[in-house]
């Protein structure tokens, strides 16, 4: 996976191949790309540019590792329509190949307004009998807001 210039990569083995999902630097996490390897998890992934399989602020940014329930593959993603990591969307992966990627939305998770993390749920991972969720609490900060506006205007990369 080295040299692909991608960010937030997630790998999964499906249909006899290793699949690498991720964004590309400079795409502002609004696009999800797919690469494939026939060898192994550290193999030569192709195509070098990747195949764009999803566009938009809702569902393009990964929100954790793929997981399986009763053999079915699922992909967690972030809902960034309102802001980074406002919620988590779970997709059932229906088909994965370089020619065709299809998924169906099956669940959406948003934080409770009065919780300790009312502003987002941006990561979910499963392991054995464990589920780990990373919540978001945005504290008002004059300097951060100013930097965010400058970063967006001039593409400084502070929040990449």
Question: In which residue ranges do the predicted regions lie?
Answer:
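Membrane-proximal basic amphipathic "stem/tether" segments
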Residues: 134-160
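Short, small-residue-biased leader/transition segments that mark boundaries at the very start
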Residues: 1-8
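Beta-propeller and closely related beta-sheet repeat lectin domains
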Residues: 9-10, 62-65, 119-122
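Hydrophobic core segments of beta-strands in well-ordered, beta-rich domains
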Residues: 9-26, 34-35, 72-80, 91, ...
């Amino acid at each position: 996976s080295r040299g692909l210039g991608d960010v937030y990569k997630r790998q999964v083995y499906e249909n006899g191949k290793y699949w690498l999902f991720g964004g590309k630097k400079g795409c502002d996490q609004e696009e999800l790309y797919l690469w494939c390897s026939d060898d192994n998890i550290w193999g030569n992934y192709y195509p070098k540019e990747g195949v764009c399989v999803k566009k938009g602020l809702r569902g393009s940014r990964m929100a954790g590792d793929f997981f399986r329930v009763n053999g079915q593959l699922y992909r967690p993603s972030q809902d960034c329509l309102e802001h980074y990591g406002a919620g988590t969307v779970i997709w059932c992966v229906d088909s994965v190949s370089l020619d065709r990627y299809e998924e169906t939305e099956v669940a959406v998770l948003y934080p409770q307004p009065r919780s300790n993390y009312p502003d987002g749920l941006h990561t979910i991972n499963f392991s054995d009998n464990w589920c780990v969720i990373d919540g978001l609490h945005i504290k008002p900060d004059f300097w951060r807001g100013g930097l965010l506006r400058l970063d967006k205007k001039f593409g400084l990369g502070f929040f990449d």
